[in-house]
């Protein structure tokens, strides 16, 4: 019987995005728990349940390089992001990092019609330890076409080989490279999802504290902010909704260089202490995400700081939904926050 269920799930997963939502409820009946007055989107929950739970938290550092390649291959094959309506061209730039001495890939996405002045610098997610420009390739093509803006996606160095603040310094190098290549910082927006959103916050704080030139706007998509895991959502959504707590602890541990990092505002965003405000900001949270509460807490800090911030919460969605626009609810949410982003970018 268990073998039949295994093959049945494999079959459903193969044809998942061709199955109408009404039929999916018949083929895969699931009970959803109401939490905080909401139930997770059915199609999203079905997709999560058909996929095996992550075991990333059990991976040893010496095996991580091999695991990264497997994850990248699987994500590229799965094609979870919708394709742009009009093909988006790309151009690879290899830039020098002054901080690390490394040569970094900065991939430029060029939509068919774009504003010649505005650009976005993007940092991908993956817990600072996995994923790449390639795994996010389809998502950024879709974003670029929808926004009609050129996007530069950075291949930053991953942890644990490169601990905090290595990737942050590379992110700063990429921002400065864009400015040095005749781009007015007033026309540059910075965006990231998950670990990449954490980098957006860190870089913005660093630039502000240095009195450096600032980007014109920020988009942070479900940022991790609290390495102490103090918020209620950590426990509420710990093991059923894509991002597992065990993986979350593992990610932070890979990034951390020493215990002092935990109280560094560049690492722990709930320790932000600047009185200056950020540029106009959009912060996205998902209701069924273990880190949604810390994202909301961080947004409150920015509000008190005087930042013009809009928090967009999608109460029936989960961590990483922006990567999965083939899911109907995820697509609607992405369109919604990108429409809001257009107003400030």
Regions found by a protein language model. Give the residues of each.
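A glycine/proline-hinged amphipathic helix-loop "lid/cap" segment
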Residues: 1-109
């Amino acid at each position: 019987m268990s073998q039949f269920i295994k093959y049945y799930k494999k079959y459903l997963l193969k044809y998942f995005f061709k199955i109408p939502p009404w039929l999916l409820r018949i083929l895969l009946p699931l009970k959803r728990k109401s939490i905080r007055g909401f139930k997770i989107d059915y199609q999203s929950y079905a997709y999560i349940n058909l996929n095996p739970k992550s075991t990333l938290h059990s991976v040893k550092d010496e095996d991580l390089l091999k695991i990264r390649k497997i994850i990248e291959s699987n994500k590229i094959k799965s094609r979870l992001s919708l394709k742009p309506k009009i093909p988006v061209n790309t151009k690879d730039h290899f830039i020098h990092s002054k901080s690390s001495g490394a040569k970094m890939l900065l991939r430029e996405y060029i939509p068919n019609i774009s504003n010649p002045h505005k650009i976005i610098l993007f940092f991908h997610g993956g817990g600072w330890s996995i994923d790449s420009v390639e795994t996010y390739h389809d998502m950024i093509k879709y974003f670029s076409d929808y926004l009609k803006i050129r996007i530069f996606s950075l291949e930053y160095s991953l942890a644990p080989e490169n601990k905090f603040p290595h990737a942050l310094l590379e992110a700063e190098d990429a921002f400065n490279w864009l400015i040095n290549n005749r781009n007015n910082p007033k026309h540059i927006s910075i965006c990231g999802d998950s670990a990449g959103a954490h980098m957006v916050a860190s870089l913005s704080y660093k630039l502000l504290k240095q009195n450096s030139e600032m980007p014109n706007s920020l988009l942070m998509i479900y940022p991790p902010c609290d390495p102490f895991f103090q918020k209620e959502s950590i426990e509420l959504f710990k093991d059923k909704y894509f991002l597992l707590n065990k993986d979350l602890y593992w990610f932070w541990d890979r990034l951390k260089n020493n215990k002092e990092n935990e109280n560094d505002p560049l690492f722990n965003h709930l320790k932000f202490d600047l009185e200056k405000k950020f540029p106009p900001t959009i912060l996205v949270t998902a209701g069924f995400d273990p880190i949604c509460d810390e994202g909301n807490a961080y947004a409150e800090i920015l509000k008190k700081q005087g930042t013009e911030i809009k928090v967009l919460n999608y109460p029936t969605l989960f961590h990483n939904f922006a990567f999965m626009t083939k899911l109907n609810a995820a697509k609607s949410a992405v369109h919604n926050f990108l429409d809001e982003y257009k107003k400030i970018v």
